[in-house]
């Protein structure tokens, strides 16, 4: 999931690939403002971390029991790594949703969204308003993660 979201972010933020959006969904002044460029760095580095954490644990099997057993269950370690990957995936998805909200505003297509998509868009915009000036986005990313973790949307 995290890899798919990161690739979609790359498409969304890369103006020469998508052909319809400004670089990094920048709604400010190109050359002066960065849009979501720094957030893409976060998504990419988080994706790289997830890829590293997704390596199988069995390659780290350690003999034990006086070398009588060479198959060691790494279930707990794997579960902890999987939990980290899931948490990281929320961060990547949050950045993707932020980019999609900016893209919807740039394209002015709010009225073309389905009723459910429009509801989600409006909920997101209630805590992540349209922006043109550069500011740190870590608080918005955390709010988006909280939103994505809500059970009923």
PLM region spans:
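C-terminal auxiliary extensions adjacent to catalytic cores
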Residues: 2-153
């Amino acid at each position: 999931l995290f890899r798919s979201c990161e690739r979609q972010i790359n498409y969304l933020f890369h103006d020469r690939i998508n052909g319809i959006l400004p670089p990094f969904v920048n709604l400010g002044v190109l050359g002066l403002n960065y849009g979501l460029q720094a957030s893409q760095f976060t998504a990419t580095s988080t994706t790289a971390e997830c890829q590293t954490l997704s390596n199988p644990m069995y390659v780290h099997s350690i003999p034990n029991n006086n070398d009588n057993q060479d198959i060691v269950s790494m279930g707990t370690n794997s579960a902890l790594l999987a939990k980290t990957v899931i948490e990281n995936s929320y961060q990547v998805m949050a950045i993707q949703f932020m980019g999609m909200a900016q893209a919807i505003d740039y394209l002015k297509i709010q009225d073309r969204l389905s009723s459910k998509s429009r509801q989600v868009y409006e909920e997101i915009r209630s805590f992540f308003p349209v922006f043109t000036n550069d500011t740190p986005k870590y608080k918005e990313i955390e709010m988006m993660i909280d939103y994505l973790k809500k059970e009923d949307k």
